[in-house]
């Protein structure tokens, strides 16, 4: 299966019959895992997801998320969860494929911690919240691919992202 800890993460592939492209809805369920890899307890006060071209946010599928703009959403679901060193927590977001006969290929969803806090007001020593800087440990991606079927349909709906805090 697909694991958030894989780096790089495998691409989840969905192949569609050409005749069914305009009749199908594809929803990708992403699990965003936050882990405290630091030495002090802390909070991930807000998480931000950067929606890739080809996917869209549907508010009815995601009542605990707020849309900032067409390609950015946030949630504060983890704001009151004190993560001790080594602790993890997860949230989910569902993104929907934009149904279009030209919308194929790899779509790379990114999520990061956009606000964090600890009782010592100590900054994260190896990343900066809310800077959308790939390569830091508070941001991760999960690629998906939609294509035209050449064989049997495979459907995967759960994809992991690992976001690390403190």
Please annotate each region the language model reported.
Residues 1-166:
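Exported/extracytosolic protein signature
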């Amino acid at each position: 299966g697909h694991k958030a800890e894989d780096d790089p993460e495998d691409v989840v592939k969905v192949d569609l019959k050409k005749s069914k492209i305009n009749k199908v809805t594809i929803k990708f369920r992403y699990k965003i895992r936050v882990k405290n890899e630091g030495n002090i307890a802390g909070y991930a006060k807000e998480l931000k997801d950067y929606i890739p071209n080809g996917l869209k946010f549907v508010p009815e599928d995601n009542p605990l998320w707020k849309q900032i703009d067409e390609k950015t959403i946030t949630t504060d679901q983890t704001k009151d969860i004190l993560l001790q060193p080594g602790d993890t927590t997860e949230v989910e977001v569902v993104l929907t494929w934009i149904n279009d006969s030209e919308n194929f290929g790899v779509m790379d969803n990114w999520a990061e911690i956009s606000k964090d806090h600890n009782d010592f007001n100590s900054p994260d020593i190896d990343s900066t919240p809310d800077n959308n800087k790939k390569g830091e440990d508070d941001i991760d991606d999960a690629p998906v691919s939609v294509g035209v079927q050449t064989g049997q349909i495979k459907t995967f709906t759960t994809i992991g992202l690992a976001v690390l805090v403190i």
